[in-house]
Amino acid sequence: EQGVRLHTRHRWLGWDENGALRFDTPNGEMLKTVTTTLLALGGGSWARLGSDGSWAPLLESRGVEIRSLRPSNCGFIRQWSPFLSERFAGQPLKQIIASTQSFRGDDISRRGEAILTHDGLEGSLIYALSAPLREQLEAQGEANLTLDLAPDHTQDQLQQALSQPRKGQSLSNLLRKKAGLDGVKVALLHECLSKEAIADATTLAAGIKALPITLTGTRPLDEAISSAGGVCRSALDDSLMLNALPGTFCAGEMLDWEAPTGGYLLTA
């Protein structure tokens, strides 16, 4: 009704020497001369759904400034012990607070749920902190994350509860009753704290409230929900037209903007 025509199984190949758009089609290469072009080609994640970032070198060859595509809304890598990885991978860390610092040193905290994977952490809570965590990785080779495993208890409350006689209870049972920690949270404490820290009520309570997790990498770009990087803001005017290519506009995940989600969820 609006005059829009959809051409499926067409891949944009850039421009020919006369500025016409080139397309690879089932019937061979097609050229199209236009006055205005809107590029909305996605980022670089989930290439099998079409957004493979192959447009980046095409624009760079025309003088458009591009920041390299990196994972965003993604999982992060931490090499766990075989016991934790084999026993608890895939289990949720529910009702926790995750904290880190921005590149400028600002404290950032979010409450929610994360998933312990066989080689790290993922889930909506981790995705929400993916930008500052990735920036730390790029700057120093590792990222520092702190988990509060019992956000509804103060450290003093936990210390007092854990200082009481166990009366034959195991530590796991005591932590479940007094701090509300399930098996995966208890296992994570044993993974990240020393035996001496676990045995002392003061350091154990501190660890429950601020468990340090060092992350060593991101999951691959192709697994990320979205990608950071893309066409730099300085390469665009206020209408999102490319300064180097008048009449050509860019939109969506192609832009260098840290979006809260990406085309993968729209497609899925």
Language-model-derived ranges and their functions:
Residues 1, 7, 46-51, 78-82, ...:
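Short beta-strand to alpha-helix junction loop
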Residues 6-10, 68-70, 219:
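Short loop/edge segments at beta-strand edges and connector loops
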Residues 8-20:
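A conserved short coil-to-beta-strand element within the FAD-binding core of flavoproteins
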Residues 12, 24-31:
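A structured beta-alpha segment of the ubiquitous adenosine-cofactor-binding alpha/beta core
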Residues 22, 36-40, 46, 97-248:
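Residue-level recognition of phosphate/Mg2+-coordinating polar/acidic sites
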Residues 42-62, 242, 257-268:
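A conserved FAD-binding loop/helix module that cradles the flavin
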Residues 55-98:
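Central beta-strand plus flanking loop segment that forms part of the substrate or channel wall
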Residues 253:
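Hard-cation-handling environments
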